[in-house]
């Protein structure tokens, strides 16, 4: 499970308005969806947070996916006439059943792992 948080998203709403923030969320969601594989499931948790469920992920495949996901923010996103290049991602990763016994533990572990801005980290107990 990947827990994805948008860094500096509030700044988009504050500077350009909530319509721009909504448009940015849609664009980022589409980029994340395109970067994932067919069996993966992307969900918006709320606000500026997403989860990506990657069935059968290993530590190696999760790290490779995290690199791919971090890459979605390499190019600026154009909203109306504004180019937004300062929003980034923080990603926490937790593997089931290695790092959690149930869905709540898995989400908690991934959330705990994502606490470093601009990084993708695998949960370590």
Question: Where is each model-derived feature located?
Answer:
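Cofactor-binding loops of NAD(P)H-dependent oxidoreductases
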Residues: 4
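Conserved long alpha-helical elements within nucleotide-processing catalytic cores of c-di-GMP signaling
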Residues: 7-34, 43-47, 51-55, 59-67, ...
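Nucleotide-sugar donor-binding/catalytic module of glycosyltransferases
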Residues: 32, 39, 72, 98, ...
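Short catalytic/binding micro-motifs of nucleotide second-messenger systems
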Residues: 34-39, 71-83
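A short pre-motif secondary-structure segment
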Residues: 41-44, 85
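Catalytic strand-loop-helix junctions within cyclic-nucleotide turnover domains
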Residues: 53-62, 80-84, 89-106
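Catalytic/regulatory signature loops of cyclic-dinucleotide turnover enzymes
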Residues: 74, 102-125
